[in-house]
Amino acid sequence: MEKAVKELHRVLKPGGRALILDTDWRSIVWHSSDKARMERVLHCWDDHLADPHPPATLGARMRRAGFRVLRVGVVPMLSPRWQPVSYAAGIMKTIRGYAAANGERHGLSKEEVQAWYDDQLRLAERGEFFFSLNRYAFLATR
C-alpha cells in the first residue's frame, strides 16, 4: 500500500486531487444462521487481500507520502433485505467462488461453502437477509 500511495503522489500534478475508496472488512454486519461458519468463510475471504483493513491507516499513509487529506467519508453498502441486483448479491457469489477454491487452507470444504451460500438464500426467502459493509472515501490533494 505504501508503494501505491507514493506512486499516486508522484504522478499527480501539484494541486491535483486524488480520491481513494477502500473497504474495511471489519465493518461487515451480515446475518447468518451459523455465525461460526460465517466467520470461517469471511476469514478465508480476507486472504484474497494484501490488507483487508486499510482505511484505519490510509490517511496517515497518504500524509506521509506528502498528500493533504481534505476529507474522509463513509460510503455504506446496505442491503436490509434481499435484492438480487445489489452489491451483497454479487459479493456472495464472488465469496462463494473464492472460498470454494481456497477454503481447504481454512478447513472449509466445498460443501460447507455451498451450505453458507444456501443459508443466505434461505434467509432471503424468509425475509431475514441483512448485509452492511462500509467503504471509506479519502479525498486528498498533492
Residue ranges of predicted features:
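Conserved catalytic/acceptor-binding region of the Class I
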Residues: R17-P84
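C-terminal helical/coil "lid" or tail adjacent to the Rossmann-like core of SAM-dependent
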Residues: R71-F129
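Short coil/turn segments at secondary-structure boundaries
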Residues: P55-G59, Q114, S132-Y136
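Core SAM-dependent methyltransferase catalytic element
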Residues: A65-R68, V85, A89, L133-R142
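A short glycine-rich, Lys/Arg-flanked "PGG" loop and its adjoining helix->strand segment in the class I
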Residues: E2-R17
